């Protein structure tokens, strides 16, 4: 607040009849009163368990281009796909139910389809309802998209969407006309869990995070051939030894999600664990696909090349490979270029009531013995993120790696600290080069922690996931119902 915006000095009649010194004194008294009133209101609301809005937008070297509210749905995963001359964003949602602004009808949260051809004017064109239920028990969190022109046995004129249906199953939809999505097939159903799957568009191989009823874990991998999406073919079920039916002893950490380098790279990087007891597993893709499919301990162990084990305090949510990195420092050394994987943990507890979750940079040049070489963390100060409300810590990275960013810049979703842009050109020394924290809105939901007298709730941004498109635009979606923001990184 300043004198020109207060409304006092800008009124000509008052200014001409009252001495300026008196006006200035009145302005300062009013400003002090408003500050005290706001603090008192916040205190009273906090004592009553009422949510209080926390902040406006904040940024450095990142600019907001466009915004889509997503009907106030809690959002998990964005994927952006070029379809002819159009660019379409597909956003998976957590469970819940709200009105579809296109139809006026209440729908269970599922998949939002947004035309982002003009990133400054994103436009919701369709919503596919998901499984009924709230939070993790409903919705359709995960989305992947492939063009039929890329899939070996698909209709070349089609575009296909692979998505979860709550925790129950996986589906394929025809989204050739984004405004009129049509279901193609249920790939698998009657599951007890799903999550962040991966789909190779050039081969059609899909690594589906599933929970088969007879397995000992909520999340493992089902490998499917979706080269013809209308006719799915199961290749094998896969997980860590000890997770399979009939095994005994402690159950290894459940799967979170895989990222494959395809046939050319011949590696799949699996992330197990969320915020504790994490494992990054390196798997030989060819052996995974062609090896014996019976889920015995020996058969499950056979494709593994190596693994990186995190502490009991950190998990492995996202495992982003950054391979073939040329570093001037090591140009003449044996082992150049070098391969890395960015292992991103997920924060789960509000207001820092858990070990800090962050990014681990793992050197996998020697795949049998991966070694951590660096970490990236967002400092709690000066943003006071532990007291803002909601989660503070890492969650995920972008997964698309277009030429302008590949091996150079990675983006990390950091819940109430927004999205962070990080220079990874020297993986031994990751360096933040920008950030964007959206403003809360009237749709932003509260986040609560238990107290001795009940609970304390605060409204806070919860940047949940981030993705980039091949044009270089950055997309972030919010877990606390704030919508999708489209950003541009400064050069």
Residue ranges, per PLM feature:
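Bacterial N-terminal signal peptides
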Residues: 37-48
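Feature marking well-ordered beta-strand scaffolds used for ligand recognition
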Residues: 30, 52-491
């Amino acid at each position: 607040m300043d004198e020109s915006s207060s409304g006092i000095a800008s009124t000509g009649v008052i200014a001409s009849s009252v001495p300026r010194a008196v006006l200035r004194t009145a302005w300062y008294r009013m400003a002090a009163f408003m500050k005290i009133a706001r603090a008192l209101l916040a205190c009273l609301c906090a004592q009553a368990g009422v949510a209080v809005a926390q902040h406006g937008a904040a940024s450095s070297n990142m600019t907001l281009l466009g915004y889509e509210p997503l009907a106030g749905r809690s959002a998990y995963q964005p994927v952006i796909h070029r379809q002819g001359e159009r660019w379409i964003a597909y956003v998976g949602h957590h469970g819940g139910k709200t009105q579809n602004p296109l139809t006026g009808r209440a729908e269970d949260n599922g998949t939002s389809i947004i035309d982002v051809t003009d990133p400054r004017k994103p436009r919701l064109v369709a919503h596919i309802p998901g499984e009924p239920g709230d939070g993790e028990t409903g919705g359709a969190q995960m989305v992947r998209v492939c063009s039929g022109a890329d899939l070996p046995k698909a209709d070349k004129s089609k575009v296909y969407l692979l998505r979860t249906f709550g925790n129950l199953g996986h589906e394929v939809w025809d989204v050739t006309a984004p405004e009129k999505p049509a279901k193609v097939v249920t790939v698998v159903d009657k599951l007890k869990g799903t999550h962040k799957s991966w789909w190779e568009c050039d081969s059609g191989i899909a690594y589906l995070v599933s929970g088969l009823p007879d397995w000992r874990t909520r999340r493992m991998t089902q490998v499917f051939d979706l080269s013809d999406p209308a006719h799915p073919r199961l290749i094998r079920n896969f997980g860590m030894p000890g997770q399979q039916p009939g095994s005994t002893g402690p159950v290894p950490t459940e799967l979170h999600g895989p990222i494959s380098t395809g046939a050319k790279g011949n590696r799949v990087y699996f992330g197990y664990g969320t915020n504790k007891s994490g494992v990054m597993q390196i798997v030989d893709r060819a052996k995974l696909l062609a090896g014996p499919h019976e889920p015995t301990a020996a058969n499950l162990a056979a494709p593994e090349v190596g693994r990186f084990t995190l502490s009991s305090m950190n998990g492995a949510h996202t495992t982003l490979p950054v391979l073939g990195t040329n570093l001037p420092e090591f140009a003449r050394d044996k082992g150049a270029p070098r391969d890395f994987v960015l292992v991103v943990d997920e924060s789960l507890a509000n207001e820092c009531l858990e070990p800090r979750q962050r990014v681990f940079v793992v050197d996998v040049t020697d795949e049998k013995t991966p070694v951590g070489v660096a970490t990236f963390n967002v400092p709690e100060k000066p943003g006071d993120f532990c007291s803002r409300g909601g989660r503070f810590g890492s969650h995920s990275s972008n997964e698309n790696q277009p030429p302008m960013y590949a091996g150079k810049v990675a983006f990390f979703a950091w819940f109430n600290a927004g999205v962070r842009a990080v220079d990874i050109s020297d993986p031994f020394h990751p360096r933040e080069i920008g950030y964007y924290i959206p403003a809360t809105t009237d749709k932003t939901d509260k986040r609560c922690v238990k107290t001795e007298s009940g609970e304390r709730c605060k409204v806070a941004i919860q940047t949940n996931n981030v993705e980039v498109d091949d044009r270089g635009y950055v997309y972030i979606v919010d877990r606390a119902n704030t919508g999708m923001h489209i950003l541009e990184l400064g050069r």
